[in-house]
Structure formats: structure tokens, C-alpha cells
Amino acid sequence: MPEYVQLGSRRVGAGEPCLIVAEIGANHNGDLPAALEMVRRAKDAGADVVKFQKRTVELCIPLEQQGEIRTTPWGQMTYLDYRRRLEFGEADYDGIAGLCHSLGMAWITSVWDEPSLQFLLTYDPPWIKIPSACLTDISLLEACRRAGRPVVASTGMSTEDQIKRAVVALGPDRLVLLHCTSTYPCVKEELNL
């Protein structure tokens, strides 16, 4: 692997300044004004990048979970409807992209499936982010590699063999691996340090 990876205008690697990414994820609850306020607050706090999540819910939610009834901030609804409500579309991301551009701030989304990757690529992202839950989706990883962008991949819940397979699928040249834990609080036996 190289000594550093170029992520947009920033180099990431040993001896480089820390790149601070504010994780917005889906904490906006599908509310664009709330998301835009989070972007502003992240900028004010010194973040370099804001990160969202993008998924095609019909592809990412197992069929047996889609009809489960959940209690949500908007009342009772199926899990599929709840996840749909959290997703932003093109007009929303246009607003996010515009605000980030005006603030001189990069933005990115974790992509959970190939249609979401293709959607993200229309915005010319500085890199592609793979969430821990998708590290074993070799088809998605290979599509990310073909996109020709640097990739940042999280490794929570993954075994060493799964991580090695992901590195092969993504290619090591422009890859940043994030050591992640997916249990909070994490017991020391699961830290893998």
C-alpha cells in the first residue's frame, strides 16, 4: 500500500494532518433543513468533510424485515417505509452539494449498493466510502474499483480474511482502511488491536 492516499484536496497517511469527517449519516431523519444545519455546525466545529449514507432500501433491507412494524418518530410504520423516509434524493443532495461548495467543504456518502454508487458518481465525489456492513459485497467493491476513485472502507464486524478479500477486490493503490468496532461499548476482546 502507498505511504499516502490523495482524498480530494487532502493527503491521508503518516505525517499528514488528521482529516476530520463529521458523520451525519441518517441523523437528519430525512429532513433537509436539519441536514443543512448539521453541515453548517460541522464546518463551524472544524470538520473537513461531512458524510451521509445512501442506499436503495429495497435492495439493502432483507425481505423478512421489510414488513416489520416499527415505532418511529412519525408513528408506527413498516421498516421499509421508515428507511425510505430517511433517504435523500437528487434534489436533497443538490442542496447539500451546493451548501458544501459554498462553505469550501467536501461531502461524501457511504454507498450501500451499486445504484447508490452510480448516483453518488454523478456528483464527482473526491472518494467513495464503503460502510462496514458492505465490506463483504465483492460485486459492490469491484464496481467501486472500476469507478477509478480512491476508496475509504470501514472494517467493523469483519474477519481478517474478509478484509484481505476486500483489499484484493478494491485494489491497494488508492485504498484507506478504517479499523472500526461495531459494538458500543466495546469489550477489549473485540477491539482487534
Q: What positions do the PLM features span?
A:
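Catalytic cores and adjacent flexible loops of soluble metabolic enzymes
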Residues: M1-L193
